[in-house]
Amino acid sequence: MNLFVTDQCPVKSAHALDDKRVGKLLMECNQMMSLAIKVHDPFGDWECGPTLLTAGQPHINHPVSIWVRENISNFEWCLSHALELFAEFVLRFDKEHASGHRIPYIASKRSCLPSGELLPFQNSARNAGIGVDYSHLPVPVSYREYLRERWETDKMPVRWTNR
């Protein structure tokens, strides 16, 4: 569960992701935003389903999930990022990612989030399994370095189709 904040701007951050991660991160954004709604409005008028909220409460205590639900500004950053990830997926693959169809419903339920200014991004740019930890660096730099390192270990060559 992560956002891979390679830039303070959610649009630029989405553009920086390689093909492999565009769809994956779109699904993760939707999971974290769905979780934020469920936590702040546990008895609300919402539903789970293919074009609705995601099911369950995965990664409820992950630091990035907590950051997304901390306030409306953090949630809005994630929402903007998800919208751009969906657009990126269409641009790169000439088809829609099914997870993108959740976004309008998720956006319609965001009023339950508390107000607040955008908080510093959660830095989770580490993976003990492969011995990578850039969490000591400033957030955008840490994620760019983390991804560079991950790309070197990927089995398939990294691609940015139509970019």
Where are these regions (language model features)?
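An N-terminal structural lobe/cap that precedes and organizes the functional/catalytic core
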Residues: 1-97
